[in-house]
């Protein structure tokens, strides 16, 4: 599979922006099948952008808004439009998006879309690329549930990779893109079949934790009702944490909740979760991802040093792995947690500077900062990849 990354910082004059993107792609040879992965800042007029792009491009586009992009040459960019073109004669793409999802019908929506897309492919899919919206209300669907339904429809052996749309920390201007459609709570999905064998790396950036621990004594999916003998909010109040309002994702963005989770087949992994909402009437906490009943919660502390270390670890591992492979994988798609960007404070280019110093020239790289990451997680006991939805991680897919 061949690839190229296109970028323009222009978003006000979209005709000029699209002209720049087309010029950058002029010498790039498109093959039989092509997919565009697009990230843009929240103020981008995507419907107009798509109209201009589709006047020349007849292939599918999938992606989302993001608070910042990662590129090989430019590094970290908070403004603009970026596009990764993936093209191949021996791969096929099937792309679509659900209607807005809620807890009542998300299973049917995702199942029907995956089944429909699978029928469009000449051979079984080998990769799922997906983008969705964050949990901004109790009716929104967490990423874990999305993964569960995709696996139930397509099988657990097909890797799921992607991210959750973000914005400039308003947490209400994010959007997901697919073709000419935009959404805040739908799920965009691309299935890829053919000659593709992706490699995945996931690193966690939370190493420091507070001493206090709580057992989750009542929970359902991403909702935690009780910690120990009291409500979830009671426990937060005892720790002098924010409990006075409903939408608290911004207040807890740098205070991840750390827990261990059973991945299956004997694999246990430590993960982190972001608190998004508080139900002040019931005392419930709503997270961006699942928190299993019976797990032990600890409050983590996200800092610049740990963020930098995890990026160095991720790129060191992926480049070492690729150096031992057949040399055909030259495209890197990265997803980093938006909280990591915030933790870097004034040094927001640190993640980009880490990979820019070691990335081979022949590689294409595009990344985004999102409010969650879909990426297989390798079990320490079995070495098996488990599809998983993350918070506070840095992930890489090499194809």
Annotate each PLM feature:
Residues 361:
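ATP-binding catalytic core of ATPases
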Residues 1-35, 40-60, 64-332, 337-345, ...:
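Small-residue-enriched flexible segments
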